[in-house]
Design a protein with these regions (language model features):
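Single conserved hydrophobic/aromatic residue that forms the stacking wall/gate
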Residues: 1-15
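Conserved catalytic motifs of the protein kinase core domain
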Residues: 7-8, 50, 259
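Domain-scale selection of a single, long terminal region
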Residues: 13-18, 270
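Active-site-adjacent loops and short helices of periplasmic peptidoglycan-processing enzymes
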Residues: 19-189, 199-202
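Domain-terminus/edge residues, biased toward the C-terminal soluble/receptor-binding domains
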Residues: 168-172, 176, 180-270
Length: 270
């Protein structure tokens, strides 16, 4: 909710005046140097969730953490890795935003949030990314995964390989969309690593995550963003929500205010 997100967003300001505990940055992408150690006083916050972390996107400095290395389901935040691999395929010249994405029977049978794709339908990659980022559509995410990886199982192997490259030590993906599956687990810290990577290397993702409403099928299908902070929190830019019975309410939120770029991850909220 708005108040909870505002509390995380204000952490940085309180710490800027603090002194005490030395916190070594724990979140950084591969091929980036470690940020300088900062002297900060960690805020005394007890959040109504299972795990959380707040980092400075630019430096990777950890500003707040709670149970950040505890493994748990992350629901549709999983789609951040699906998006990362997709944008990387575009950067490599393997795809364009106009590439047609076919819909398989497998994608059609995805449950949860969806845009009700029909087998044989085709959308451009641009349209599918809107469905994934705005409506968190599981069917669209799996269709994109099949396009990029050839099949969802093959794509999941790519997801896990990329996670290992990024140092996401406690993450195992079992699917491309985040539906509850045994062994499909991550941590708040690993989600922050993944989020920082896509925001840093694929900033075009913000074009999609910042969309509040859009349409598909010539206006017949309405897309409304699942991230309600877009309407309530000054400076919010993304990134991805997630909710399942096993994961609870989750979000990895990116925001920019007064020159600060922050990433807040909350997992397992009621």
């Amino acid at each position: 909710d708005t108040d909870r997100s505002r509390g995380l967003g204000d952490v940085y300001k309180r710490q800027a005046q603090g002194k005490g505990l030395r916190i070594q940055p724990a979140v950084q992408t591969q091929a980036e140097p470690a940020a300088q150690t900062l002297t900060v006083t960690p805020p005394q916050l007890t959040l109504p969730c299972r795990a959380a972390i707040l980092i400075d996107q630019t430096s990777g400095t950890v500003l707040y953490e709670m149970n950040a290395d505890q493994t748990m389901p992350i629901a549709s935040i999983t789609k951040v890795m699906t998006l990362l691999l997709t944008f990387e395929a575009v950067h490599a010249g393997r795809l364009t935003m106009d590439t047609a994405v076919p819909v398989s029977e497998h994608a059609y049978h995805m449950g949860g949030s969806q845009i009700w794709l029909e087998p044989g339908e085709q959308f451009t990659l641009d349209e599918m990314l809107k469905a994934v980022c705005v409506s968190s559509a599981n069917d669209a995410a799996v269709a994109v995964a099949e396009l990029v990886g050839g099949s969802e199982p093959a794509f999941v192997q790519q997801m896990n390989a990329r996670a290992a490259e990024l140092g996401m030590e406690h993450t195992t993906f079992r699917n491309a969309c985040g539906l509850d599956t045994e062994g499909h687990l991550s941590t708040a810290r690993d989600v922050a690593i993944m989020s920082r990577t896509i925001l840093t290397t694929c900033p075009e993702v913000l074009h999609y995550t910042g969309i509040w409403t859009d349409t598909l099928r010539g206006g017949q299908t309405q897309l409304v963003n699942t991230n309600k902070l877009l309407r309530r929190y000054n400076g919010i830019t993304g990134l991805k929500t997630g909710t399942t019975g096993g994961a609870g309410v989750c979000i990895t939120a990116s925001a920019t205010r007064d020159g600060l770029n922050l990433i807040a991850v909350v997992l397992g909220a009621p």
